[in-house]
Every structure is written in C-alpha cells, then in structure tokens.
Amino acid sequence: MSEPMKPMEIEQRSFAIITELLGDRVLAPENELVIKRVIHTTADFDYADTLSFSPHAVQQGIAALKGGCDIVTDTQMAKAGINKTILASLGGEVHCFMSDPDVAQEAKTRGVTRAFVSMERAAMLQKPCIFAIGNAPTALLSLEALMEENKVAPALIIGVPVGFVNVEASKEQIIDAARAPYIVARGRKGGSNVAAAICNALLYQIRR
C-alpha cells in the first residue's frame, strides 16, 4: 500500500494537471498564477477565459499587499479563506462589516442592502485596501458610486460576485469605468471561494 500524498504534493500534482489540461492555451505570464489558483479552487476551466485583468493589476495588488494594505470582503466565508498569517506578516488584516449589527440596522433604516452599507463603512478605513467581492453585486455598485464621489480609492478591486441579478452589470461597470485596478470574473460565475483564491494567489507570490 502506497503512502498517502502530503498536502503540498497533492497541490503540486493538481497544478501540473491544470497546466496539462490547459494545453496550448496561452495565459499572460503576470496573470497565470492567479488564473491557475482559481481553476484549482473551482475545477472550472472557464475562468481561463472569463477572468479579466486591468493592466498590471496583479503587480499593483502585490505591491499594495507588500505595503501593508488591508483586505475588505463582503462575506465571512471569503474572510475565512484568506491566508491571514501571510497578510499579518505584511502588516495587513481582513475586514468584513456585513455581520455588524449597526450595519444591518442602518441598511434596514435606509432601505438598502447590508453590502451597500458595508462598503461605505470600509471607505472610512484609514489605510489602503483591496476589496474582494465574491457574493454581493450591490457591494460593487456601492464601490463604484463611492469612487465616483472620490470617497474611496481601492488599491485593487477583485470583482467576482456570483448569481443572476445585477451580477454581470455590476462587473461590467467596474471594467468600463476603470477607476481602480481590477480583477473581474465576467459573466455569472464567481463566489467567495474565488475571491479568497485570488487574494491568496497574490499573497503566495510574495511568500513562495
């Protein structure tokens, strides 16, 4: 009976399989590790085509993390999936305001979503932030409105909400306006796991 594979061996083998299955598809070298990390997380090769990067987005995200920026997520799941040990070693932390009672109360009073209010709360943070949005398109819409009003300047927007209502439009708005560097999963696919995977792909390039 052969010995069970170690986690690192499993990951290395998985990435080798991904590379093999991608075949002769050409990925931009600066984006390749992000794309493969997302495929590794989802087993979905569509992301090789649907992930859209603004020029130098990966380099800008890595530079921001090296500078000690924080990460803001729209779900506790995304927050849980991000490698906080590496992030903390760089001087950053992860924030998610979605579950804060005062955010829920304000959203109810104003008749807007908690995601919308949570982005307003995040805009008050006193340091650069990467915004990793994997669930709520209204978070992206809120971010776009805040950027238009010069109330927030994201170091990077990871726009990968999943679903059917406002999802595609919110992503395209981030791409079309191009007010901040972005990594966006075009179409309906995405999710908190994808948002966390992209954050980790950037962090692992710093600590590999």
Segments predicted by a language model, with ranges:
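Feature captures the catalytic cores and cofactor-binding loops of soluble hydro-lyases/lyases
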Residues: 125, 139-157, 166-169
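Charged, compositionally biased N-terminal leader segments and the immediate start
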Residues: 1-29
